[in-house]
C-alpha cells in the first residue's frame, strides 16, 4: 500500500537530493577540477 505519507517523505528526499546536486554543480563551477 502506498500512503500519501510515504509520498511526502519521498518528495522531501527528492528535493533534498536536487539541492545537493545544485550545490555540487555550483561548487564545480567555482572550483573546476584540474
From Swiss-Prot:
Keywords (A to Z) from UniProt: Leader peptide
InterPro entries (UniProt xref): Trp_operon_leader_peptide (IPR012620)
A biological process from GO: transcriptional attenuation by ribosome
Taxonomy, superkingdom: Bacteria
Protein name, as recorded: Tryptophanase operon leader peptide
Upper classification of the organism: Bacteria, Pseudomonadati, Pseudomonadota, Gammaproteobacteria, Enterobacterales
Gene that specifies this protein: tnaL
Amino acid at each position: 500500500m502506498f500512503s500519501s505519507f510515504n509520498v511526502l517523505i519521498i518528495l522531501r528526499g527528492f528535493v533534498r537530493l536536487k539541492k545537493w546536486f545544485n550545490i555540487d554543480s555550483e561548487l564545480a563551477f567555482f572550483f573546476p577540477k584540474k
